[in-house]
């Protein structure tokens, strides 16, 4: 069995695989203040609760976009699992030719998503990840990572609206029944949700034109993927566990 860990700006997701089967996964808030013991005891308690023997974990794979967390997390793995974690970064085999001007600038999560999507769906692809930031990644039919787009995430956009407009209330990110709002809350929900749907569809269409390939599949992942995909005209499929799957595949290519 292997433990995979995806450290994002907002949440950290843990998953355990037995071969290609995901046994379970858990989510916690990403916190820069946690000690290695806090991480270690948290992970061990999760596994114990699910009756997963810690001693049967053969490897740990970590991807992170939050560097300050890595020292404590890596130390936790060494202390509680007696393993040297595999950290996705330079030197790790991904099987993808990165066409970015500076490949080191590409976030590990974006490459991992591309690895998983190529394995599961084949190219060409556009991957839309609805995280703290929303990212769009273009992958060619040859398996090349072409580049992409980075936008403020839905929650960041909503928070900016709340903070900069004194009279507007905080609202839940819920899709209203109509675009035309009949009160302040539904008008704000409409602007945030349907405005974001329009942004996603426009960017995807432009990317498809620039990629100049046929049958480009669009895969959505991330916490708010279902909310947007339900209204999107361009998203073909949702896979909320794409990053965990990518970590498993990368481990197989590097073990």
From Swiss-Prot:
Locate the residues binding substrate. Answer: 100, 107-110, 184
> Where in the cell does this protein reside?
Cytoplasm
Q: Which reaction does it catalyse?
A: (R)-pantothenate + ATP = (R)-4'-phosphopantothenate + ADP + H(+)
Which biological pathway? Cofactor biosynthesis; coenzyme A biosynthesis; CoA from (R)-pantothenate: step 1/5
Naming one, the record's GO cellular component terms include: cytoplasm
Give the binding site residues for K(+): 129
Has keyword Cytoplasm?
A: yes
Q: Does the keyword Transmembrane apply?
A: no
Which cofactors? NH4(+); K(+)
- Just give the chief location class: cytoplasm
Identify the keywords attached in UniProt to this record, alphabetized.
Answer: ATP-binding, Coenzyme A biosynthesis, Cytoplasm, Kinase, Metal-binding, Nucleotide-binding, Potassium, Transferase
- Report the function annotation for this chain: Catalyzes the phosphorylation of pantothenate (Pan), the first step in CoA biosynthesis.
Q: How does it assemble?
A: Homodimer.
Checking PANTHER family in the record gives: TYPE III PANTOTHENATE KINASE
* Name recorded for this polypeptide: Type III pantothenate kinase
Native source species: Acetivibrio thermocellus (strain ATCC 27405 / DSM 1237 / JCM 9322 / NBRC 103400 / NCIMB 10682 / NRRL B-4536 / VPI 7372) (Clostridium thermocellum)
Q: What lineage is on file?
A: Bacteria, Bacillati, Bacillota, Clostridia, Eubacteriales
Q: Which gene encodes it?
A: coaX
């Amino acid at each position: 069995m292997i433990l995979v860990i995806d450290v994002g700006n907002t949440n950290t997701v843990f998953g355990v695989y037995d071969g290609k089967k995901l046994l379970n996964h858990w989510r916690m808030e990403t916190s820069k203040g946690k000690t290695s013991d806090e991480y270690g005891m948290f992970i061990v308690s999760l596994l114990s609760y699910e009756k997963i023997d810690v001693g049967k974990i053969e490897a740990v794979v970590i991807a992170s976009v939050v560097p300050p967390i890595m020292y404590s997390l890596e130390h936790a793995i060494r202390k509680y699992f007696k393993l040297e974690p595999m950290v996705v970064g330079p030197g790790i085999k991904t099987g993808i030719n990165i066409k970015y001007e500076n490949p080191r600038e590409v976030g590990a999560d974006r490459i991992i998503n591309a690895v998983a999507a190529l394995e599961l769906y084949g190219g060409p692809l556009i991957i839309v990840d609805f995280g703290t930031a929303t990212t769009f990644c273009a992958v060619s039919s040859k398996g090349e990572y072409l580049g992409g787009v980075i936008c403020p995430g839905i929650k960041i956009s909503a928070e900016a609206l709340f903070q900069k407009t004194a009279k507007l209330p905080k609202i839940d990110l819920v899709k209203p029944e109509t675009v035309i709002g009949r009160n302040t809350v539904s008008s704000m929900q409409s602007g945030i949700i349907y405005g974001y749907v329009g942004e996603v569809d426009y960017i995807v269409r432009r990317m498809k034109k620039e990629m100049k390939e046929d049958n480009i599949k669009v895969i959505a992942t991330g916490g708010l993927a279902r909310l947007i995909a339900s209204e999107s005209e361009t998203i073909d499929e949702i896979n909320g566990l794409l990053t965990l799957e990518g970590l498993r595949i990368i481990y197989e290519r590097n073990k």
